[in-house]
């Protein structure tokens, strides 16, 4: 039984784990673990209807309905898996080739492409365009003229496909943090449990040269599972 005089403060972000949802609604295998979050926010809202009457027309009875619980996660870092969950169906495929374009001037097209760290990779085949977008041959290149060279490179990486029919999925979500006791000044365990959370489709990636590094936001909308319990807030102690 909770002591009504016990009070706690929270000043720490949560580590959040996403799980698959099994066919019976139970928690499945973990699919994503986030331990680099900057902000993790839980917000509950609802609508109201009320009966008013009497002198001054004050509210007499208030009905609450339309409960909404949303969770906002702001991550300092991203992984291939987190990006796949944010923008697609949670899957990522192996990538073997990419297309690159570089500019050059002169009568000879480059045969190498410079990557990070000053390393170079060979260009085995390319297409050259002039500033009007027309294809030109290597023997027609002119000095002091700018051209665009497009080519494919063999790479190792991952690809996330975002199609018109692909949207983020629904997951069982838990978040673990600490609550500090006013009495003892010690941290105790605190967890939120969401049996059914839909990842929202609205996402933004900011790429800019100045300012703070980009953050990666994931917004969740809490849904009602079969037993009606949309979320649990648990403060617990593992004991000595």
Language model segments and positions:
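Hydrophobic membrane-targeting and insertion signals
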Residues: 2, 149-154
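Beta-strand secondary-structure signal
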Residues: 70-74, 148, 172-174, 217-221
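Solvent-exposed edge beta-strands and adjacent loop segments
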Residues: 2-85, 196-217
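Beta-strand elements of well-folded, non-transmembrane domains
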Residues: 20, 75-79, 153, 175-181, ...
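Extended beta-strand solenoid/passenger and fiber regions
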Residues: 80-142, 152-186
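Short, solvent-exposed loop/turn segments that connect beta-strands within catalytic domains
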Residues: 24-27, 183-187
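Extracellular interaction modules
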Residues: 66-70, 140-148
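Mixed-charge, glycine-accented linear interaction segment located at domain edges/termini
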Residues: 126-143, 189-240
């Amino acid at each position: 039984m909770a002591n009504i005089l016990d009070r706690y403060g929270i000043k720490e972000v949560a580590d959040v784990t996403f799980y698959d949802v099994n066919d019976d609604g139970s928690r499945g295998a973990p699919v994503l673990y986030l331990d680099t979050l900057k902000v993790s926010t839980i917000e509950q809202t609802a609508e109201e209807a009320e009966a008013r009457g009497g002198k001054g027309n004050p509210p007499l009875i208030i009905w609450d309905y339309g409960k909404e619980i949303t969770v906002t996660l702001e991550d300092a870092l991203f992984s291939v898996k987190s990006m796949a969950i944010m923008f697609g169906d949670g899957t990522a495929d192996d990538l073997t080739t990419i297309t690159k374009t570089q500019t050059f001037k002169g009568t000879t097209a480059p045969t190498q492409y410079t990557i990070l760290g000053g390393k170079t990779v060979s260009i085995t085949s390319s297409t050259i365009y002039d500033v009007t977008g027309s294809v030109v041959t290597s023997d027609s290149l002119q000095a002091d003229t700018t051209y665009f060279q497009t080519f494919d490179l063999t790479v190792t990486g991952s690809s996330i496909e975002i199609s018109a029919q692909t949207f983020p999925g629904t997951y069982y979500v838990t978040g673990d943090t600490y609550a500090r006791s006013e009495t003892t000044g010690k941290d105790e365990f605190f967890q939120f449990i969401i049996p059914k959370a839909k990842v929202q489709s609205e996402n933004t990636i900011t790429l800019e040269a100045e300012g703070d590094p980009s953050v990666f936001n994931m917004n969740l909308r809490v849904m009602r599972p079969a037993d009606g319990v949309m979320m649990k807030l648990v403060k617990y102690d593992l004991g000595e």
